[in-house]
Amino acid sequence: VKTEFSDGKGAFQVEGVAGNRYLLSVAAVGFGRYWTSVFETPATGVALPVIQLAPHQTAQLKEVLVEGRKPPYEHYPDRTVVNVADSPLSAGATTLEVLGRSPGVTTDASDNLSLRGRQGVLVFIDGKRVPLTGNELADYLRALPADQVQSLALITSPPASYDAQGVAGVIAISLKKDQRLGTNGSINGSYGRGEFGKFTGGLSLNHRRKNLNIYGNYAYTDRQGFTRLDFQRYFLATPQLPAASSVQYNDQRTHLRSHTGKVGLDLTLNKRTLLGASVSGLASRNLTETQSNAQFQENASQLATFYTSLAAQDIKRPNSSANLNLRHAFADSASAASLTLDADYARYHTTRLLGLYTYYNAPFRPTNLLSGDQRSNLDIGALKADFSQPLPHRARLEAGAKVTRVTATNDVAFANTVDGMTTTDQNISSQFQYYENVNAAYVNLVGTWAGTKLQAGLRAEQTNTRAETADSTSREWHYLKLFPSLLLQRTLSKAHTLTLLVARRIERPAYGQINPLRAYFDATSYQAGNPELVAATSYNFELSHTYKQKFSTALAYARTDQPIVNVVQPSPDGGRVVVNRNVNLATQHFYTLTLTAPLELTKWWTLYANGLFYYNRYAGTLAGTSLDRGGFATNLTLNNSFVLPGDWVAEVNAFYESREVFQFQVIQPRGQVTVGVQKSLLGKQASLRLNVSDVFYTVPTHVTSTYDNFTEAYFRRDDTRVITASFTYRFGNGKVAAARKRAAGAEEELRRAASQ
């Protein structure tokens, strides 16, 4: 029914098992297993007498090897956990690709992540918030190899100990950590081939003694690929310009190289106090070359205009972070109060160089070179304290506070070269600065009484932001908001459990969404932030039923005021250039039904099925276009796991996304099938994995956006069908020790929430 671990003195506590008859089994390495007689657990709980284990009589115990394989997916009332490390499908993949195959996770044409059909997702990596959105976040996750990831937690209703940011929820990414005693490590390498090659290699080392643990890891990625983009655009007539249309074909080559690393130590100062420190970094360089061929037709009576553009971009992103944390228990027992302190600093730097050549077929339109040099820095500092106090009757009170400060600077210079003459383009060259301070405090009560589990919390966040441009234009926001959260779970019988989830959350505009400076894709398309964006707030409600602790049915509703959405519109500069940016609409109403079924079809075949059926309705106005429409959509995920003879493991993953009406867009259906096998070698110290992603090449993106003044049909295909081979070798001591949790930023609160 349940498994728990004792503390250092052998004390343990098992929650959520009231009102039934049980047997208790106790085991420890070097001792014989102990079984109690049958006993009942009343609503008030039961205290067992002292249990003594008898040592084994074996004169010498050489080695005990404990083997186990986690299921690919684990479902809980407020989250789904994706166990990435043991999956043959993760070999050679990126973290973004693994997310795209996870139940309920999708990406749109602009690389915005959605969780259960809703945008506005907050991403953590080892407890550190990633302050990026859109294609910047997608590029970051592309640069992070999936071989370094242990698990993903898709949390739709986080407790009060989490930041309130993210109206759709939280994606918590946990990286691998070695828990073995002594000196241990692993080496891995993979090579994949689609139309272009993809290489990943890595090394991890860990030295653990009684009071000290030193660890480090490094990974290098070299991935080449392509993207094909086709656009059909229709511009309606305005008082300034006649109606027009264009057809554009883009062929893009990409070359991404990244270095990922982390070093740290955990030090046991005494039996109650643990100190940890770590430094990590992810440095990437992405080279892209894009050739665009386009045809413009102003109206039927004029000749068409043709142009070809060549765009070369060199984007460098050296990112680094540091963490110092301390955990102290105020007594030696498992019921002692504890305090965790964290200090974090992170720096995200971006250099973006652009060279955009445009050649026209018209003699009166000379060749033009647009060159750009954009440099940005994002500095984040955070201090955090979490206190936990166990209470009588198996309850616990938690409280904490957090202070975060963000400083962002951006400087971009564009120059035009025509007929050999170069001039600075002052209209699109500028500087931008952004400051943000969030002060937060929370209280959370957790307890189980007579078959009812309660988790009730309240979080307060006070936000102060200021945005400044080069012309001294400044905007400030100051506000205080409260964010209640509730998890109420009632065990009706051995087979039936009901859970109610309620939460209020916020979506503050990210720095990149406010930054008005431009990033050009080609001669007719650029991306820019919107300084007029305001924060969105959401009220989320969910009622779920679980049958036999496996089969889950959930009904949910969410209302979001002033939701932030991504749109494509003609540039305010005029002409036939379009801008990709974010705007606020009035409201979003979201209704969803989620069905989850983990099925053990045979001893060697396990099927995890997840069905998401939802209705999404938006209301608002943009560029004279009134919007009040919605549509039904479906997202299906099937994952088959096979444990085969001869130490073989196989997986087949398939997902399907139906046609969807989303904001101003109509998104066509798509799907993907990925297969993989894994073989253990060298006495299970090594493994060989082989997988093929997007077997049937069925995951293109086809979107039509319709406004009163503009229509765009968009088609995108990437280098997604890839065959990959991977080899991993593990060396060192096989004995496992209890790992010290490296609490970085919010990592301790993530761990604590996941155990509830």
Please identify what each model-predicted range represents.
Residues S25-F31, G45-L89, D108-S110, R116-G120, ...:
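Short, acidic, small-residue-rich periplasmic hinge/interaction motif at the N-terminus
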Residues V1-A11:
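Short, acidic Ser/Thr/Gly-rich low-complexity loop/linker segments typical of extracellular
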Residues T260-S284, S309-E468, K550-A554, H589-Y614, ...:
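Face-selective signature of the C-terminal outer-membrane beta-barrel domain
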Residues K128-T156:
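Short acidic/polar hinge/loop motifs at secondary-structure boundaries
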Residues A47-Q52, T95-V98, L137-Y140, L154, ...:
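N-terminal periplasmic accessory domains that precede
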Residues S371, I380-K384, T423-S430, V534, ...:
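Outer membrane beta-barrel strand-and-loop segments of large Gram-negative receptors
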Residues N464-T465, K494-N540, L555-G575, V695-D708:
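Surface-exposed extracellular loop regions of Gram-negative outer-membrane beta-barrel proteins
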